[in-house]
Amino acid sequence: MAHGVPFDHNYYIVECKEETNAEAQAGAMAATSTEEAPGAVEVAQAAVASSHDSGGAIGCATVKESESDSESESDSESESDSSDSSDESDDDSSTSDEDTSDPEEAAAPSVAAVAAAAAPPTVPAAAAIQIPGPYRYRPPRRHVRRRRRGPPFHFAQWQVEEMESLFEETQYPDLLTRGELARTLNVPEVKVKVWFTNRRAKQRKIERREMLRNIPPGAEDFIFITDFEEPS
């Protein structure tokens, strides 16, 4: 014989009531914190009242509906807040980009200008190849005054005879003798000195010629004649 299992219905109803009361209070607190769903409080209160009258099943359904409504409202609010914040961030970023891009682009030099400034100056090939050669010392030019040769000085016949008579006496007259003769002939003393020098050279040539005439043939190769002039 099957015996029925005893079941305490009152215990189940009490537990449902406690659960519905706790869920209703949580939904009411969420609705008051958001302050944008005033109907949620009324729904929670109605759910509490109906739970006392109709039992735990209905109370659970109403609480679930209030939770779904509050979740949908909170999701919509979070989406709206996120969209507003994203729009504001986009606007701020766009304005900051516009503010920062213009002065930077205006202040930044162009790539061509930077490359032209960094490039070294071009040097012609001819100037780069030139190599200085060895230094050659060039002595300064000396301006030598050339003596102008005037017309040759010619003595008169009587002047030559006076100098020839003195030459027969001495071939090397001293300075005083040449000075007296120059005053007598009315000529510079230098001219008298030059005439005596030339006359001695002429006399040596005459003497050498006479000596060579008197030498026998074949002996000329062994004779060395030195022509020198004694100092005056």
UniProtKB/Swiss-Prot annotation:
Listed transmembrane segments: none
GO molecular function: DNA binding; DNA-binding transcription factor activity, RNA polymerase II-specific
Portion annotated as DNA-binding: 148-207
Family: Belongs to the paired-like homeobox family.
Gene assigned in the entry: Rhox13
Region (Disordered): 45-114
SUPFAM superfamilies: Homeodomain-like
Gene3D superfamilies documented for this protein: Homeodomain-like
Pfam families found in the cross-reference section: Homeodomain
Assigned keywords, A-Z: DNA-binding, Homeobox, Nucleus, Transcription, Transcription regulation
Protein name per UniProt: Homeobox protein Rhox13
Organism: Mus musculus
Record's function text: Probable transcription factor.
Compartment(s): Nucleus
Domain of life the protein comes from: Eukaryota
